Amino acid sequence: MPSLTRILGATVVSALAAATASAGDFAAFTPLGFSEDGKVFAFEEYGQEDGSGFAYSNIFFIDTEKDAFLEGTPFRLRTETDNASISAARALAVREALQMIQDYNLLDHPGWLAAFNPVTENNGDNGTIRYRAHPNLSPVSEMILETFPLAPNAACRDITPDARGFRLTYRSPEGAEREVHEDERLPESRNCPLDYRLGGMMTYGGGGPDAVHVALVIVLSQGFEGPNGRWIAVPFRP
Protein backbone atom coordinates (compact mmCIF):
# COMPACT_ATOMS: atom_id res chain seq x y z
CA MET A 1 0.00 0.00 0.00
CA PRO A 2 2.55 2.63 -1.03
CA SER A 3 -0.06 5.35 -1.30
CA LEU A 4 -1.04 5.01 2.36
CA THR A 5 2.60 4.91 3.36
CA ARG A 6 3.14 8.19 1.50
CA ILE A 7 0.14 9.71 3.28
CA LEU A 8 1.55 8.69 6.65
CA GLY A 9 4.93 10.04 5.67
CA ALA A 10 3.48 13.39 4.68
CA THR A 11 1.65 13.59 7.99
CA VAL A 12 4.85 13.43 10.00
CA VAL A 13 7.26 15.56 7.99
CA SER A 14 7.13 18.34 10.58
CA ALA A 15 7.00 16.04 13.63
CA LEU A 16 9.49 16.39 16.44
CA ALA A 17 12.72 14.58 15.50
CA ALA A 18 14.07 11.93 17.84
CA ALA A 19 17.02 12.99 19.97
CA THR A 20 20.46 11.73 19.01
CA ALA A 21 21.95 8.81 20.87
CA SER A 22 24.57 10.99 22.57
CA ALA A 23 21.89 12.84 24.55
CA GLY A 24 19.57 10.01 25.50
CA ASP A 25 16.70 8.67 23.47
CA PHE A 26 13.57 10.81 23.22
CA ALA A 27 10.91 9.33 20.97
CA ALA A 28 9.05 11.51 18.50
CA PHE A 29 5.24 11.43 18.61
CA THR A 30 2.78 11.25 15.72
CA PRO A 31 -1.00 10.81 16.13
CA LEU A 32 -2.60 8.44 13.62
CA GLY A 33 -6.21 9.31 14.37
CA PHE A 34 -9.47 8.04 15.87
CA SER A 35 -12.13 5.59 14.82
CA GLU A 36 -15.34 7.30 13.68
CA ASP A 37 -17.07 6.60 17.00
CA GLY A 38 -14.04 7.77 19.00
CA LYS A 39 -13.65 4.41 20.72
CA VAL A 40 -10.15 3.83 19.30
CA PHE A 41 -7.16 6.18 19.23
CA ALA A 42 -3.81 5.29 17.68
CA PHE A 43 -0.39 6.92 17.69
CA GLU A 44 3.19 6.18 16.77
CA GLU A 45 6.40 6.87 18.66
CA TYR A 46 9.72 6.38 16.93
CA GLY A 47 13.40 7.17 17.18
CA GLN A 48 16.86 5.72 17.68
CA GLU A 49 17.96 3.95 20.84
CA ASP A 50 20.84 5.34 22.82
CA GLY A 51 23.69 2.92 23.29
CA SER A 52 22.80 0.44 20.53
CA GLY A 53 21.81 3.04 17.94
CA PHE A 54 19.04 0.72 16.69
CA ALA A 55 16.03 2.41 15.09
CA TYR A 56 12.55 1.66 16.41
CA SER A 57 8.88 2.40 15.81
CA ASN A 58 6.01 1.54 18.14
CA ILE A 59 2.37 1.89 17.07
CA PHE A 60 -0.26 1.87 19.82
CA PHE A 61 -4.02 1.30 19.49
CA ILE A 62 -5.94 2.48 22.57
CA ASP A 63 -9.46 1.47 23.58
CA THR A 64 -10.64 4.89 24.79
CA GLU A 65 -13.47 3.42 26.88
CA LYS A 66 -11.35 0.88 28.75
CA ASP A 67 -8.05 2.82 28.69
CA ALA A 68 -6.32 -0.34 27.46
CA PHE A 69 -4.44 -1.60 24.41
CA LEU A 70 -6.51 -3.30 21.75
CA GLU A 71 -5.91 -7.04 21.53
CA GLY A 72 -2.81 -7.88 19.54
CA THR A 73 -1.24 -4.45 19.99
CA PRO A 74 1.00 -2.51 20.28
CA PHE A 75 3.15 -3.16 17.24
CA ARG A 76 6.81 -2.80 18.22
CA LEU A 77 9.52 -2.81 15.56
CA ARG A 78 13.25 -2.59 16.30
CA THR A 79 15.90 -2.86 13.61
CA GLU A 80 18.83 -4.68 15.16
CA THR A 81 21.38 -3.63 12.55
CA ASP A 82 23.77 -0.71 12.79
CA ASN A 83 22.94 0.78 9.40
CA ALA A 84 19.12 0.54 9.54
CA SER A 85 17.34 3.88 9.29
CA ILE A 86 14.44 5.25 11.30
CA SER A 87 12.41 5.40 8.09
CA ALA A 88 12.97 1.66 7.57
CA ALA A 89 11.74 0.89 11.09
CA ARG A 90 8.68 3.08 10.58
CA ALA A 91 7.85 1.46 7.25
CA LEU A 92 8.00 -1.99 8.84
CA ALA A 93 5.76 -0.88 11.72
CA VAL A 94 3.20 0.63 9.33
CA ARG A 95 3.19 -2.61 7.35
CA GLU A 96 2.36 -4.55 10.51
CA ALA A 97 -0.32 -2.09 11.65
CA LEU A 98 -1.79 -1.23 8.24
CA GLN A 99 -4.81 -3.54 8.41
CA MET A 100 -5.97 -2.06 11.72
CA ILE A 101 -5.31 1.49 10.49
CA GLN A 102 -7.62 0.76 7.56
CA ASP A 103 -10.20 -1.19 9.58
CA TYR A 104 -10.75 1.78 11.90
CA ASN A 105 -10.44 4.44 9.15
CA LEU A 106 -8.03 6.34 11.35
CA LEU A 107 -6.71 8.68 8.67
CA ASP A 108 -10.25 9.95 8.03
CA HIS A 109 -10.66 11.06 11.66
CA PRO A 110 -7.47 12.84 12.74
CA GLY A 111 -8.95 14.68 15.70
CA TRP A 112 -7.13 17.73 17.01
CA LEU A 113 -3.70 18.06 18.53
CA ALA A 114 -5.16 20.65 20.88
CA ALA A 115 -1.91 21.30 22.75
CA PHE A 116 1.68 20.13 22.43
CA ASN A 117 4.37 20.49 25.08
CA PRO A 118 7.45 18.40 24.14
CA VAL A 119 10.56 18.23 26.31
CA THR A 120 12.14 20.94 24.16
CA GLU A 121 9.43 23.42 25.17
CA ASN A 122 10.71 25.72 27.93
CA ASN A 123 7.55 27.17 29.44
CA GLY A 124 8.40 26.76 33.12
CA ASP A 125 5.49 24.38 33.82
CA ASN A 126 5.74 20.73 32.85
CA GLY A 127 2.60 19.68 34.69
CA THR A 128 -0.25 21.90 33.47
CA ILE A 129 -1.78 22.47 30.05
CA ARG A 130 -4.68 24.81 29.27
CA TYR A 131 -6.40 23.99 26.00
CA ARG A 132 -9.54 24.28 23.90
CA ALA A 133 -11.24 21.09 22.75
CA HIS A 134 -11.87 22.54 19.28
CA PRO A 135 -10.44 25.48 17.30
CA ASN A 136 -13.86 27.17 17.24
CA LEU A 137 -12.97 29.13 20.39
CA SER A 138 -14.60 26.56 22.67
CA PRO A 139 -14.17 27.09 26.44
CA VAL A 140 -10.76 26.48 28.01
CA SER A 141 -10.16 23.23 29.90
CA GLU A 142 -7.13 22.33 31.98
CA MET A 143 -5.14 19.15 32.55
CA ILE A 144 -2.90 18.85 35.59
CA LEU A 145 -0.19 16.22 36.09
CA GLU A 146 1.27 15.48 39.53
CA THR A 147 3.89 12.90 40.48
CA PHE A 148 4.31 10.93 43.69
CA PRO A 149 6.64 8.21 45.05
CA LEU A 150 5.69 4.68 44.03
CA ALA A 151 7.51 1.41 44.59
CA PRO A 152 9.56 0.36 41.55
CA ASN A 153 9.02 -3.02 39.95
CA ALA A 154 11.50 -5.78 40.76
CA ALA A 155 13.67 -5.15 37.69
CA CYS A 156 14.14 -1.47 38.60
CA ARG A 157 14.58 -1.70 42.36
CA ASP A 158 18.34 -1.10 42.22
CA ILE A 159 18.26 1.27 39.23
CA THR A 160 15.58 3.76 40.27
CA PRO A 161 14.84 3.21 43.96
CA ASP A 162 13.13 6.62 44.02
CA ALA A 163 10.66 5.72 41.28
CA ARG A 164 7.55 7.81 40.80
CA GLY A 165 4.02 7.41 39.53
CA PHE A 166 1.64 10.08 38.26
CA ARG A 167 -1.95 11.23 38.51
CA LEU A 168 -3.98 13.35 36.10
CA THR A 169 -6.71 15.79 37.09
CA TYR A 170 -9.08 17.34 34.56
CA ARG A 171 -10.49 20.79 35.30
CA SER A 172 -13.58 21.65 33.27
CA PRO A 173 -14.27 25.12 31.82
CA GLU A 174 -16.66 25.60 34.76
CA GLY A 175 -13.88 24.84 37.25
CA ALA A 176 -15.00 21.37 38.37
CA GLU A 177 -12.10 18.97 38.98
CA ARG A 178 -12.09 15.22 38.31
CA GLU A 179 -9.27 12.73 38.65
CA VAL A 180 -8.93 10.78 35.41
CA HIS A 181 -5.89 8.64 36.25
CA GLU A 182 -3.74 7.63 39.19
CA ASP A 183 -1.03 4.98 39.09
CA GLU A 184 -1.43 2.08 41.49
CA ARG A 185 1.71 0.30 40.31
CA LEU A 186 4.50 0.80 37.79
CA PRO A 187 4.19 -1.50 34.76
CA GLU A 188 7.33 -3.03 33.30
CA SER A 189 6.55 -1.36 29.96
CA ARG A 190 7.70 1.96 31.46
CA ASN A 191 11.17 0.57 32.13
CA CYS A 192 12.53 2.46 35.15
CA PRO A 193 10.69 5.80 35.34
CA LEU A 194 12.40 8.83 36.85
CA ASP A 195 9.80 11.51 36.16
CA TYR A 196 6.92 12.54 33.88
CA ARG A 197 5.96 15.50 31.76
CA LEU A 198 2.55 16.46 30.38
CA GLY A 199 3.34 16.37 26.67
CA GLY A 200 0.08 17.44 25.04
CA MET A 201 -3.64 16.91 24.55
CA MET A 202 -5.58 15.26 21.73
CA THR A 203 -9.32 15.81 21.29
CA TYR A 204 -12.03 14.29 19.12
CA GLY A 205 -15.70 15.19 18.80
CA GLY A 206 -15.37 18.81 19.90
CA GLY A 207 -17.50 19.68 22.90
CA GLY A 208 -20.30 17.20 22.18
CA PRO A 209 -21.53 14.45 24.52
CA ASP A 210 -19.36 11.83 22.79
CA ALA A 211 -16.18 13.90 22.89
CA VAL A 212 -12.93 12.12 23.70
CA HIS A 213 -9.88 13.79 25.20
CA VAL A 214 -6.47 12.11 25.41
CA ALA A 215 -3.70 13.27 27.73
CA LEU A 216 -0.24 12.67 26.27
CA VAL A 217 2.32 11.92 28.97
CA ILE A 218 6.07 11.70 28.43
CA VAL A 219 7.73 9.06 30.62
CA LEU A 220 11.33 9.92 31.50
CA SER A 221 13.21 6.73 32.32
CA GLN A 222 16.79 5.70 32.98
CA GLY A 223 18.66 5.15 29.72
CA PHE A 224 22.15 4.06 28.72
CA GLU A 225 23.53 7.53 27.94
CA GLY A 226 21.03 9.74 29.76
CA PRO A 227 17.29 9.91 30.37
CA ASN A 228 14.99 8.40 27.75
CA GLY A 229 11.55 9.71 26.80
CA ARG A 230 8.56 7.59 25.77
CA TRP A 231 4.86 8.40 25.32
CA ILE A 232 1.71 7.27 27.13
CA ALA A 233 -1.82 8.15 26.00
CA VAL A 234 -4.52 8.42 28.70
CA PRO A 235 -8.06 8.75 27.25
CA PHE A 236 -11.13 10.04 29.08
CA ARG A 237 -14.55 11.57 28.48
CA PRO A 238 -14.81 15.14 29.77
Give the predicted meaning of each segment.
Residues A18-T20:
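N-terminal signal peptide c-region/cleavage motif recognized by signal peptidases
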